[in-house]
């Protein structure tokens, strides 16, 4: 068959064929690249309205290095979908309906640090959160409220609630700042708590009950998720009347599609693989096509420095922070490059020492060097 863009076809050893392309056609491509600039390669083939939910770190800790891989994958996926002609919304799901014990302990941790900043010698309990990020949130509370809470009793329910809320807001502010330093911003920060507060969770459960996909056992309300391919049925409401984590998820998935999105894409860590079947099952039980939800699972990431895997942050704490332990070490651009250099489905190891090198074995430097040479060549023509 004729190939007008090819001038010659040559066999080049066993298993290889060389295609020689017409120079004038290649020249035309370069002209289009120059004319279209950043829009080169874009198309209108998509035409869908898509919401991509990614990162969604709990509001009781900073964005971790693993969360950084999630951010790089999700943000790039959004850009690709938009370039293909889709209307894309970047969404961060705030898990602010977390177990009250977790968030209350986080609030207590911030309160203790807050009083320490004011010169008190309060002890940090074993159940409390460590890490410099807790001190950062306490500093923000101090900056906003001064000594207003210095004599407060953390065992008082009102004080507990106040510091839970202040700590959550302070942590989310820190998360936003870390993500912006990584070049990632969101169109929507969606609160899980609102789903419970305005009845959307209760309504979703009611729909599943009306459609006959629940039963009661041992005082709890169960979802017949096995009828949709899940490996076992799931509890929706515990025997004490409290909802499980799944109820917020199913109401959130429903809400996305109710907002008019044709497709929803979630970017999750591989440790959440078990949630995929039950999430799709809940959509089917609610009467939606589960194929409208896609889940991209990515593998873990580790940091290597001095030939050793880094196990703890350079700041106090037992987690690796995206900003302090990676961006501040190698820069935003290098961090994003390394996160995207391997398939999301493969485990990733980032060598900090390699990323800092100004030699060709550092892939970031090699690409930047090639770009600089190309620009130089253009400037001399």
Regions found by a protein language model. Give the residues of each.
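NTP-dependent nucleotidyl-transfer catalytic core
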Residues: 1-381
